[in-house]
Amino acid sequence: MGLLEATTGAFALLLRGDAALWHIVWVSVKTTLSGLILATPPAVVLGYLIAMHRFPGRRIAVWLAQAALSLPTVLIGLLLYLMLSRRGPLGDLGWLFSQPGIIAGQCLIGLPVLLAFTLAAVQALDPRYAETALAHGASRLRVMFSVLHEARYGVMAAVISGFGRVISEVGCALMVGGNIEGHTRTITTAIALETSKGDFAQGIALGIVLVTLALAMNGVLVLLQGDAHNPGARL
Amino acid sequence: MTPLLSVHALHKRHGERLLFDIGRLDIAAGAAYVLTGANGSGKSTLLRMLGGLERSAACSVEFDGLHLPLYPYPRPLRHAIVYVHQHPIMFSTSVAHNIAYGLLARGGDRRLLRSLVDEAMDWAGVTHLRDNDPARLSGGEKQRVALARARVLQPRLLLLDEPTANLDGAAREQVIALIPTLIDQGASVIVACHDRDLINLPGVQRLKLRDGRLESR
């Protein structure tokens, strides 16, 4: 099958609303967003705390957070597989080869990205924001929300980068999800499978969806950043 | 007269270098002070320590009859003392929201909030900037918004770090004109500055940091 023929077939699949294809997209989006929703609050809070506080071992924490960015997803998949397998410590959950298992993996993959980017965004922020909040009687919690509000574009970039890393990973989803048709097959595991079978049309169609999702997420960020100099809350 | 705030054994080191060592500093209720000293003498650091923004070594304070540590900064001081930066920073909301920041943070009566903010904006002459983006304000406007943001909290002690630095002409005069009105309203005020017009304000006591010691004149 030539590239032109495969691409034409891919558009035909997308346009005729192929149910199997769109179910794969749905599983990917659902597991990615669920993983990100679970990872974002702890990662952002941890990133903020590491950025704002001086404590023994802080430099090691920063180093670990940044080093975790380059962890191969297949290694995370392997560790999670061992944890979730029948004899593993979390085997009783029955999450292996299930969507909750993929979500757990996506959460672990997204967490370091969100943490490291939030840490960098908060560290880059003028320290007078936190000082001004404190000097005007804000509680520690309110200081955190005020600082994160000022660093919101960096935090949003963290979420979008996390989304990109999670939705495009294949190793963990394949190992923990098992690539079961109609259940745990995601965009990336489907592309890997269909390509190995020589069905390039579905692979290209899913690739187009993946790129479109990435463009859409980044477009949202660009739109929000474009609004950065408009005053926010009014009284 | 019982001081509003008494600070004992306040000292600060930057590495091996002793920045200052102050045996005792008394701030009277409703009194105004200008704090002078050469660049690097520790004026800003002293104000930041009093405002709870800088760590201090073992040091105790008496505030309103209470014996408190200066670090970790105690809640009664956090609600009574407001520090204003030399170059104030504005949250990326509106000017009015910036002025309301401390009131919102302290959870005061929301029905009163709008009238308090309106009154503070009127006092600082920034009512016309109400819904503006603070990022677009001039240095003088930012300083006046910062003074309004501090004043609206009715602090017992206001710490102003070189409020006229880098301002000139009308902007500087507008800021200078606001400071006596703050003093008249009964707050104690310490102004770190080099500005002769502030140093020579009537009724202001002078403090000078020199060679790590605080001189009262």
Predicted regions mapped to residue ranges:
Chain B
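Catalytic Walker B motif of ABC-type/P-loop ATPase nucleotide-binding domains
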Residues: 158-161
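Conserved ABC ATPase "signature" region
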Residues: 111-129
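ABC-family nucleotide-binding domains
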Residues: 168
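Conserved catalytic motifs of ABC-family nucleotide-binding domains
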Residues: 88-97, 198
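Conserved ABC ATPase signature
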Residues: 133-137, 141
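Helix-to-loop junction immediately C-terminal to a conserved catalytic motif
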Residues: 51
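Conserved ABC transporter NBD signature motif
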Residues: 59-69, 77
